[in-house]
Amino acid sequence: MKKFLPLVLLALLSPAFATTVQNLDSVPSAIQHPEGKQIFAEQMAGATPAKGFGELPQGLSEKQWIAWVAPNEDPDNLILTGAKSWGKDGKYIGIACFADNKADAEQAKKYADNTCPENYSNGRANKLYLGVFSWQNPQLTPIARSEKPLNQLSEWNKAAEKESDDESVRPLAYYTKLDLAPYRIAPDTLAFGVRGGYSDAYSGGGAFYEVLELYTIKDSKIINVFSNLVYYYSDIAGDWNKDGTRQHNISESKYILKMRSAKTHGFYDLERVNLQDKSSQIFRWSESLQRYAP
């Protein structure tokens, strides 16, 4: 079987924007992309992330929602719920995030930041469930659900576990938002995105990785069909200045996903483009894997 480099490693081989600034105050103006500016604001100024998962539609209670989307989870372990309108006909994509126990859930909610946060006992994201449903009249009509938490469905996690010997490549440690751009991967198939990531902390800074996962509906189940790095940001402290401030080395890489007109097995090929040097990588549908592969 042909062996591929881990997806993150492939991403980091691509050229990145890099610059050095003279002190911490100069970092925000050196960051090129809004993702990095938000990371800096959260890390250095304590800014709260936006509600990337939205809110349940008016009239839909948390109790009713989690009874369908995650029937085997204990309601006492709930951290977060949310939903966003998707397309027409009253369709929504919703989430429910659970901790392993009530104490961990209460601790997570105490420091609530609108994300499905890290489970510090295993270094992974807490249990995030997805559901697609219709809400009209008002009544919940089920369409599809993930059945398992995303950290078990994620192709990114599987690749990170099985293929990587790079210590910087890890399973996702948190989920941040729904990405409902119109990812039409086939004429009759619309996918939706979930964004998450993980970070590395250094004595003089850190690195942050954002991953886009695309999910689609197959029968009444939600399956992961694509996962890859879409943003990388690092801030590493450098030399000391005479005035006691310290230089900072900033690096960024950002990628966008394009749907190509060419098809493989009925699905449009995906092109991930590096915005820095316009290099790209093509992903095609694999019938055997039932997802995209490089």
What are these regions (language model features)?
Residues F4-L13:
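Sec-dependent N-terminal signal peptides
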Residues G87-D100, R184-S199, A262-E271:
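Acidic/hydrophobic-patterned starts of short beta strands in beta-sheet-rich repeat architectures
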Residues Q107-R124, A201-A207:
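Short consensus segments that form the blades of beta-propeller domains
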Residues F133-K148, I217-S227:
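Surface-exposed loop/turn elements that mediate protein-protein interactions on large endomembrane-trafficking
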Residues R170-F208, L212:
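Eukaryote-skewed repeat-based solenoidal scaffolds used as protein-protein interaction platforms
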